[in-house]
UniProtKB/Swiss-Prot annotation:
Origin organism lineage: Eukaryota, Viridiplantae, Streptophyta, Embryophyta, Tracheophyta
Domain of life: Eukaryota
Organism from which the protein derives: Arabidopsis thaliana (Mouse-ear cress)
Signal sequence interval, chain numbering: none
Transmembrane region(s): 15-35, 55-75, 86-106, 161-181, 214-234, 266-286, 356-376, 399-419, 434-454
Protein name: Lysophospholipid acyltransferase 2
Catalytic activity: a 1-acyl-sn-glycero-3-phosphocholine + an acyl-CoA = a 1,2-diacyl-sn-glycero-3-phosphocholine + CoA; 1-(9Z-octadecenoyl)-sn-glycero-3-phosphocholine + (9Z)-octadecenoyl-CoA = 1,2-di-(9Z-octadecenoyl)-sn-glycero-3-phosphocholine + CoA; 1-(9Z-octadecenoyl)-sn-glycero-3-phosphocholine + (9Z,12Z)-octadecadienoyl-CoA = 1-(9Z)-octadecenoyl-2-(9Z,12Z)-octadecadienoyl-sn-glycero-3-phosphocholine + CoA; (9Z,12Z,15Z)-octadecatrienoyl-CoA + 1-(9Z-octadecenoyl)-sn-glycero-3-phosphocholine = 1-(9Z-octadecaenoyl)-2-(9Z,12Z,15Z-octadecatrienoyl)-sn-glycero-3-phosphocholine + CoA
Amino acid sequence: MELLDMNSMAASIGVSVAVLRFLLCFVATIPISFLWRFIPSRLGKHIYSAASGAFLSYLSFGFSSNLHFLVPMTIGYASMAIYRPLSGFITFFLGFAYLIGCHVFYMSGDAWKEGGIDSTGALMVLTLKVISCSINYNDGMLKEEGLREAQKKNRLIQMPSLIEYFGYCLCCGSHFAGPVFEMKDYLEWTEEKGIWAVSEKGKRPSPYGAMIRAVFQAAICMALYLYLVPQFPLTRFTEPVYQEWGFLKRFGYQYMAGFTARWKYYFIWSISEASIIISGLGFSGWTDETQTKAKWDRAKNVDILGVELAKSAVQIPLFWNIQVSTWLRHYVYERIVKPGKKAGFFQLLATQTVSAVWHGLYPGYIIFFVQSALMIDGSKAIYRWQQAIPPKMAMLRNVLVLINFLYTVVVLNYSSVGFMVLSLHETLVAFKSVYYIGTVIPIAVLLLSYLVPVKPVRPKTRKEE
């Protein structure tokens, strides 16, 4: 009877039983995170965090999932215990190697594309968490002088205990879809230190309003996704009818396919945000010294309006998968820039390549993230032209702002086809159908930026007479 109910429930929302089981466990992270608040001791909180995360993993993916999770967790902890000076390096490369192996073995991208589910998505989040923990423990050996602010804030002087480490990795199912957070934040939250310390007024932030907002947002996102997805199937890209359409209709379909797919991620991240908020970990401070309004940005992984209305492609990482973008900036982008040098296209491309490999070795992922590097660099060029225009020519500046917005819309939704369909053939068929417009435009903009280099106009200071 239970199986029949699961089958009927899954059919009613157009997903498989495996996906429905995952969704139920994923939503259950909200009440489970809420109960964390009532666990009396630090040790109890760590045990509850680890046990609840492992149990939800078992219900969602089966017993083997926890065995998979143990591998990067063991790599990270062993590297910290055995050879601290290279613990971050060891965990980064071995953790990614195991993740890539799982991606290849399970062909996870194909499973997700066909509506299936497996534990590799959670393994992706977990891999980032163990890497950041190891790198921060490595940073704890270094002198503060010369460290970036993020390194100073997140570095670990002492090695976390095994139960603290397990609690951090599996915390109430937060490894399902993120957001990625730091070990130091987890420890301070558990021990009620830092911003989580009870204030002199004895005031604690109430998470309920922010949690309800996140749940309401998730419901809207799911409703929109379920409404749109039957109307814009990805299979249409290789159907003869698609090729019979005119250019504008084909490009419009690409835009709507990307727009539709994003609502699935908006839903997932809204639920994970609600879960982290209700636990208290999502608290990020007060808006002012009077402690009248709490901020809950630590749990935020997406700004929907920010993504859909981004004025520049440079803003996309600030609004989309925010915590992973932050992780990539702190642990890849900033660390491959030589001291005293500025980051350039190479650092951007290397960071996007790491992001592509993290998602899986599908051609569509690689193409998307290489495209996104071109997109961002092209957007920077347009912005430089915009800044070079004198303030008195405000109309022309606004025209370039509009051009940058349209550029971002066109290139982002064109590029996202690869992320959705994954295969090289389907990606190239879709790109060819719109004459590779999203590849040609960024390259043309970048070439033009070399031919027409500009410097921002600086306001002149008046000379004293």
